[in-house]
Amino acid sequence: YESVFIPVGTKHRIANKTDKNVVVIEVGIGDNISDTDLVKIYNKDNPQASANYVRLDKSPIAKLEPAFKDNLWGGTKIRDVYGKKCDYDVIGESWELSAHPDGQSRIAEGRYKGMLFNEYLNIIGKEALGWKCQAQDRFPILIKFIDAKQALSIQIHPDDEYALENENEYGKNEMWYVVDSEPGSYLYCGLSRDASKEEILERINNNTITDILNKIEVKAGDVVMVKAGTIH
């Protein structure tokens, strides 16, 4: 798969010189859709011939209200710095895009205001989610803000195979983007060295597991990929 960024005002076209189908997904940013917002499909043998057009969906963008979590390790930045409206004294997480039953986003405005995100997805249908979601029976993405004022628990998330077999859930890869950080902030991701099962169990029991984890100092703008099965 390839992606191309096309700045405003740049002439461009899509051409296919092969006998195989090419799938192109065009994403535009703007308030309105006009006749210029079209994907034009050229005939490979005669580029000047009349072309087919595929018009973008004119449905409005659905703005969401987050679901909040009052985790004990949380702080107040999600409300005080980022302006999220929540009455919790401490906010650990703000689930901005979520169809997970443990905390669903809600439609923020318009005809479906107040509706749970999962209910809204049932109305608009799978086709509106893009071709990569067609084979899945639930919305697969969760986007959240985390305010970690204190250390979180050490965790390992399963992959799809294990999670579907044992929990009827999808596995969980994570991508962390550090929006802001205090001096000396760090994350744990993966083991710093090889360790036996017996050593890991012993360190879990005596609360020294972080001694063999990979400690990563972070600053605003850093990105960390945490694949399923990685201790963090």
Language-model-detected regions and their locations in the chain:
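Conserved metal-binding segment of the jelly-roll/cupin
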Residues: 1-19, 24-27, 154-157, 218-232
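Transition-metal
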Residues: 36, 43-195
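Double-stranded beta-helix
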Residues: 15-53, 189-212
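Intrinsically disordered, low-complexity segments enriched in polar/charged residues with Gly/Pro
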Residues: 1, 130-132, 140-141, 163-165, ...
